[in-house]
């Protein structure tokens, strides 16, 4: 008898080992697919990321200035937290000044973000949900412009997202599996996120505080609240100490003067509302009402689709619908344009179902549903984890909550929310399966497959117009032929004047040219963005120009439409521009210069000092 029982126990153990190995194999395979897709996207879009004029040059110039002994904020203007420039400086000191260093760092960060999203999705639902979220992030992260993850407008944004996802994963692991060490590391990750992008750091503290408070309420224990808060507070103390060092050694006004974010500085009063509103941080009651209605409609449509999946004909209709959208989006786009409102209808379907613009409010509904579930079952750890994660996702996306789109500024804030949407979608399918007795895992797999196909065909980067290689001392970047030609002209001009020991200033924005020619701006303002300098600060800059006495000024036709004031010298910083016109004269033109960016690319006028 014992022999039979032992044989049965051995068989059960063998089956468990087999099941575990199958799960581990699936997990390893999905991770390998994520890494493989990232490498394919990197190969397909190689070196076509970033911009040689807008923002990206700051990521090269600022760490080089730090290595020259300059102090952030005091000697170099920088609009975000202090951590990323010093990491970049350490990378340059270790590996040397080369774009490959930044490309590699960006690629590693991107893969890290995707794997973290995958792990969170697999923990809260099932691996296919996490895989779909990871794929969405990857397809957004390799865009051939400066809104990408490989060579972005700011590595502070992409690295902050990585740290925030790490924090979220550790908090969720603590909720589900227990252990205080995960919470300690999560607190440190949250503090580091605050030192990169404070608004993303706030989302970290939303999940930390939310999870702590909800757990304490569920257990009805003030001791739990105090003990867990003390566990993750060291990270906040580290961040506060570093910020305090800058504030005490400089001044609060000087530090705030650098930042784009907080209310108070001159920039916020002049440009903040337009810039933030344009990015999606706006409160229009009518727009919010439309988005709430769209969120409910989107969830309702997916519920109907999930119910239809109980039959083979329903699955065939879903496949046909996805195939039609793919055809209209990629295979026969000219046909779409000839249809009455064809492109608009296609965009509406995509933004209602596969990447809803109303995703913030879907996430909000998912959070409220998780709170309700937690109230009904206070000891349900999965409900607590879902409530904590949805709070994190909507907090992270608050900066762009009315403009949730799979491109542009939103890609640094919306990936956690996209996973929140997928989790909600899986819950909707679950509820529909219960209602119609369908096979839930199969239904989730079918819908996630449809989501993956649509993401691939909508977001996979097409052929780029960036066909010309712009080669510098830092390596190469692909840009448009005109940008490459003008970029070479500007670079060669600065290098020639450097040999003659003549100083060249690039305005209003072009820090990459300072970096690749190993020259410096005349003072801490290496970039002129609308609204950052008050009239008094403009006069101070003019005084610095007089002291530096540059022989030449290269004035590009950079347009600042995103700020609502596109033209340097006309819409902003008129004092500086008038001084240049009165002390310099035009001697050359690179490209076809049109004030305010009319050239559509890169063009510049060369001014020489009136001696």
Tell where the protein language model's regions lie, with residue ranges:
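Membrane-interface alpha helices of multi-pass inner-membrane proteins
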Residues: 182-198, 204-212, 243, 323-327, ...
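Aromatic- and kink-enriched transmembrane "portal" helix at the membrane-lumen/periplasm boundary
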Residues: 99, 113, 135-161, 170, ...
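Transmembrane-helix signature of polytopic, membrane-embedded enzymes
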Residues: 117-145, 161-162, 177-185
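Short hydrophobic alpha-helices at membrane interfaces in multi-pass membrane enzymes
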Residues: 170-192, 221-234, 313-322, 380-392
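Hydrophobic/aromatic-rich transmembrane helices and adjacent perimembrane loops
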Residues: 202, 341-366, 402-439
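Short periplasmic/luminal acceptor-recognition loop of GT-C membrane glycosyltransferases, typified by
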Residues: 79, 463-532, 541-546, 550-562, ...
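Extracytoplasmic catalytic/substrate-binding loops of multi-pass membrane glycan-assembly enzymes
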Residues: 47-62, 73-90, 97-100, 250, ...
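Membrane-interface transmembrane helices that cradle and orient dolichyl/undecaprenyl
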Residues: 159, 164-185, 216-222, 297-307, ...
